[in-house]
């Protein structure tokens, strides 16, 4: 298994699919990485040479991925909460942030129903 950005990449999958195992790299970004490095997207990781894997590592390093990306997202949410803006309050209360209705639905975000006390 090749190791890129601290993640073990599966050997038996195509390069584009394998790169998506890295947090922060989706299909489009993976295709862009393959195009920039000149690596065949349909080639399997086990068939790539060490030089090609090094090229992939260098290209992935240009993007914010894994722990840095998670930290960045959490810091942005924390900033909204500290500002006390509407979006921050919604995050703090665990409610939908982007204007969805909450009278019905929104169960995933709100969690399980709380029993009505009498």
Curated annotation (Swiss-Prot):
Region Disordered, annotated ranges: 93-118
Any one GO molecular function term: structural constituent of ribosome
Gene Ontology cellular component annotations, sorted alphabetically: cytosol; small ribosomal subunit
SUPFAM superfamilies documented for this protein: S13-like H2TH domain (SSF46946)
Domain of life of the source: Bacteria
Record keywords, A-Z: Ribonucleoprotein, Ribosomal protein, RNA-binding, rRNA-binding, tRNA-binding
Pfam families (UniProt xref): Ribosomal_S13
Disulfide bonds: none
rRNA-binding found in the keyword field: yes
Residues spanning the signal sequence: none
GO biological process, one term: translation
Entry similarity comment: Belongs to the universal ribosomal protein uS13 family.
Protein purpose: Located at the top of the head of the 30S subunit, it contacts several helices of the 16S rRNA. In the 70S ribosome it contacts the 23S rRNA (bridge B1a) and protein L5 of the 50S subunit (bridge B1b), connecting the 2 subunits; these bridges are implicated in subunit movement. Contacts the tRNAs in the A and P-sites.
Quaternary context: Part of the 30S ribosomal subunit. Forms a loose heterodimer with protein S19. Forms two bridges to the 50S subunit in the 70S ribosome.
Name the record gives this protein: Small ribosomal subunit protein uS13
């Amino acid at each position: 298994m090749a190791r890129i950005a601290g993640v073990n990449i599966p050997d038996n999958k195509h390069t584009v699919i394998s790169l998506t195992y890295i947090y922060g790299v989706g299909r489009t970004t993976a295709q862009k990485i393959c195009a920039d490095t000149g690596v065949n997207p349909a080639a399997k990781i086990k068939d790539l040479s060490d030089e090609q894997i090094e090229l992939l590592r260098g290209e992935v390093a240009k993007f914010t991925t894994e722990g840095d990306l998670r930290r960045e997202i959490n810091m942005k949410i924390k900033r909204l909460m500290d500002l006390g803006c509407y979006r921050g309050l919604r995050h703090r209360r665990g409610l939908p942030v982007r204007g969805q209705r909450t009278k019905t639905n929104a169960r995933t975000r709100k969690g399980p129903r709380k029993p009505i006390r009498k």
